[in-house]
């Protein structure tokens, strides 16, 4: 059964927009996700399927523990963000909920950078 009248949110990374040392693999993979999102938004618009991407900055998750549980690394990372902190899962999930809401049905093919100002400080 094909989907229709729904929303898909893909996850990229803010690093694709600024270029960070030692992030070549994730940036190249996530840039592909952004292209997929834009193309899928166009392809599936006829089924009223909206496709968007969010690009978070560093967010406190199990995957980022090596940074967020290391005091020195955490302080350095916080300084990279204009809001002087790393993101929390709720910072990201709020935007996902917004994009999935059927009331917001005029948004498709977009990439939303949710990075606490990381991309503005580089």
Where are the regions that the model predicts?
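Residue(s) in the substrate-gating loop at a strand-loop-helix junction
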Residues: 13
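Short C-terminal tail/terminal secondary-structure segment
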Residues: 18, 97, 108-122
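Active-site "substrate specificity/gating" loop of NAD(P)-dependent dehydrogenases
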Residues: 19-23, 45-46
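Active-site helix of classical SDR
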Residues: 29, 37
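Alpha-helical segment proximal to the catalytic Tyr-Lys
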Residues: 42-46, 105
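Short, flexible catalytic-loop segment of classical short-chain dehydrogenase/reductase
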Residues: 51, 56-66
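A short C-terminal helix-loop "cap" of Rossmann-like NAD(P)-dependent dehydrogenase/epimerase domains
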Residues: 67-81
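A conserved structural motif in NAD(P)-dependent oxidoreductases
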Residues: 81-92
């Amino acid at each position: 059964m094909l989907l229709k009248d729904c929303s898909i949110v893909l996850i990229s990374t803010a690093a694709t927009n600024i270029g960070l040392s030692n992030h070549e693999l994730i940036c190249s993979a996530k840039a592909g996700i952004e292209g997929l999102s834009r193309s899928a938004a166009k392809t599936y618009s006829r089924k009223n399927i909206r496709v968007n991407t969010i690009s978070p900055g560093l967010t406190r998750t199990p995957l980022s523990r090596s940074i967020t549980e290391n005091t020195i690394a955490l302080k350095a990372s916080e300084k990279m963000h204009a809001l002087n902190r790393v993101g929390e899962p709720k910072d990201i999930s709020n935007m996902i909920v917004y994009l999935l809401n059927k009331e917001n049905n005029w948004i498709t093919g977009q990439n939303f950078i949710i990075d606490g100002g990381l991309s503005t400080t580089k």
